[in-house]
Amino acid sequence: SAMQDPWAAVTGRPYLYAPDCGRGNDGRYYLYYCLSGDKGVGGYHGPIGVAVCDTPDGEYKFYGHVRFADGTLCYRFVPFDPAVINDGGVIRLYYGTWYPYDELPPGEREKYLPIQAQMFGKTVEEIVSEPGGVMGPVCCTLCDDMLTIKDGPVRILPADTRGTPFESKMAESGLVEGHKFYGHGFYEGASIRKIGGIYYFIYSSVNNHELCYATSRYPDREFRYRGVIVSNGDVGIAGRRESERLNHTGTTHGSIECINGRWYVFYHRQTHGTDYSRQACAEPIVILPDGSIPQVEITSCGLNGAPLAGEGTYPAVICCNLTDGHMPHGGNASFTGIPMISHDEHDRFLTGLKQGTSIVYK
């Protein structure tokens, strides 16, 4: 329970947001998380908590908070959506988020500093004193105690994305109203993998509905944008545009993993017309000889490894596309009157269907 963390009761943040788990050099499993309140309130305020267990599937017990060698808790940058990897005995922790405040025209950035301070639980002085600002994903190494920072944190992608492959923008009104992002740059949901000596940094992009990735020969620098792995609205498949999304799109987090010699991407999509109810999904992916991962199309097969058998019955909620031709992007919004996956005390089902709704299984 998150309530084991003493900060949960003090701050009124009882939820573990976007956790990640790694095995320590002592053979135990460590769960890294950030505490959050309802609908993400306070989730940017840190610190990063850690729970520990002898087995990967629980039961985890509160262990401590990520800190510097002098014992002070780590609040540098934005402690959010942590990811961890045991890199041959070196424990690496990644975290962060990104908003385009630092790319605003002169004079505008200063106007939004109080908004940043409120969002991130910092003072304006703390924000302006951090070279390059507090935005972007960062990496640090931990001691074997899995709590104490040994080196870093250092930023691994440019905070100022202008003129880079990570260039991303947001309409000025969106700075207050919510997700009005454009581009494939980092937003949140960091994850890290090492494949064939290459580091894969997987993240939820500012477009919000897709997992993207960048690669490097190094764990903490020189990452190169490589592309989109999956979109929960199949945006980008066959040139499909945002307005042509095949599902209600919204936040997706996830990563890739090799299971029995085959690679898969794990992600989630929206149900019940809200960004705060999500269905876990998976698709097989291919890593090409050059290290690239072509974007995968959503299917109804998941981890089946082959087409579903043409007999028996399947849940309606495994449809890969559900659209009336005008599906919204959710961000933090909720919707009624659209086709959606839902449930009651008896079953899961599709609702909000109307003339012209497409329900696709493949």
Each predicted region: which residue ranges?
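Carbohydrate-active catalytic/glycan-binding domains of CAZyme proteins
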Residues: 1-362
